[in-house]
Amino acid sequence: MDNLTQYIDWFRHSSSYINAHRKKVFVVLLTGETLAHDNFSRIVHDISLLHSLGVKLVLVHGARPQINDALTSAGHELRYHKGLRITDSEGLQLIKQTVGAMSIDIEAQFSMGLANSPMHGADIKVSRGNFITARPLGIIDGVDYALTGVVRKVNAEAILQHLDKNSIVLLSNLGYSPTGEVFNLSAEDIATEVAIAMQASKLILFVPQCGVSNNNGELMSTLSPVAAEALLREIPADNIQSKNGTLVSLAAAVKASNKTVHRCHLISFADNGALIQELFTRDGQGTLVSKDNFEWLRQATINDVGGILELIAPLEEAGILVHRSRELLEAEIDYFKVIEMEGMIIACAAIYPLDEECGEIACIAIHKHYQESGRGDHLLRALEKEALKQGLKKVIVLTTQTAHWFLERGFQPIGINDLPPKKQQMYNYQRNSKAFVKLLR
């Protein structure tokens, strides 16, 4: 498949996401590290694309490294307690100058419209205002945070009025009090509280890495708030605040998910197109934190045998699947992948290597309450990825009742004599299954 064909195929399949995202409110956190990265101009283009597709966008920008540079250049001491900046009046003046200049620069980027740029014809309007009411953080452990503040109230109604006028709303890390004071806030705190107040469909947080990884360095593509909280509990609070922007954002995602925000996404600000990949492809790019119908696809273990047997039993009785005993399933469990939802196995499938080049996909089963939901495609992609990882060049499948499903996913019919010799010897002529093959790329 050439690049043009791949692009056309992806664009067609993105229509369901375009329709799902239209008129929804997304809150996007742009940390100071995000703004400083070379990829930020492309992030602006991708955000502009979302706007053109009808997404209502609230952008919250931080300025932590830029503020540090400004304070250091002025010879001002950087003071922190528990990872949070202590802001005095002199420092606040420098912070206001720095943040104000950054907000203007962001507006300028969204105002671009040169004929040879992706922004041509966008005509984006950016609105700013005193939408965030703040209060002082106060004294903690005997330490006075002075003009460091926290969100007291979000004027969600006023923000929505600007969104309804087709504007992008831009917020900084500054908040304002009814007495006319200005406070230095955490951008993560503002983004979280705005997303909650707006009942946003998504909170999108740009982080240094591709989301959250486990101890083996493997991406955790989905997390429930409970699982995310468990990860955060293993890390001292000071480290969460001061040493890892991903962990700060993960804590924000947990808070938002436990309130009114359906989905929180942690994606890399360094990867070109990460925002588009996360929102318009099934596999995404980073980590999704959500408590809605939480499920995850993983390698099966011996503890899953009972759940798999319960899942496949009705299909075996109907003659759709070949019968597997508990002993056989225990012996072959390493070939299986499962989708687990809240402790229940709702789908499974297996990939059996037949020779050095070919594997067999088998035992695809999905719980009757969760069919017609794309989980079969999710499993199939995972098995194909596993086959490629094992160095296989093609996969086969034998089926009695789902031939068209496999044809629609790139499989081609073959004769029994075209099967690998090992599979020919095991072929059950009584079942009379049809055989299909798919070349892997």
Please identify what each model-predicted range represents.
Residues 88-118, 156-157, 163, 170-194, ...:
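Polyanion-binding loop/helix "lid" in catalytic or ligand-binding cores
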Residues 1-58:
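N-terminal glycine-/serine-/threonine-rich phosphate-binding loop
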Residues 364-372, 401:
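A short, internal acetyl-CoA/4′-phosphopantetheine-binding micro-motif in the GNAT/acyltransferase core
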Residues 419-441:
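C-terminal "cap" of GNAT-fold acetyltransferases
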Residues 72-170:
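Ligand-binding beta-strand-loop-alpha-helix segment within the catalytic cores
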Residues 292-322, 432-435:
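Short amphipathic alpha-helix that is part of the acyltransferase structural core
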Residues 372-389, 397:
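Conserved acetyl-CoA-binding loop-helix of GNAT-fold acetyltransferases
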Residues 323-367:
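A conserved beta-strand-loop-helix scaffold within acyl/acetyltransferase catalytic domains
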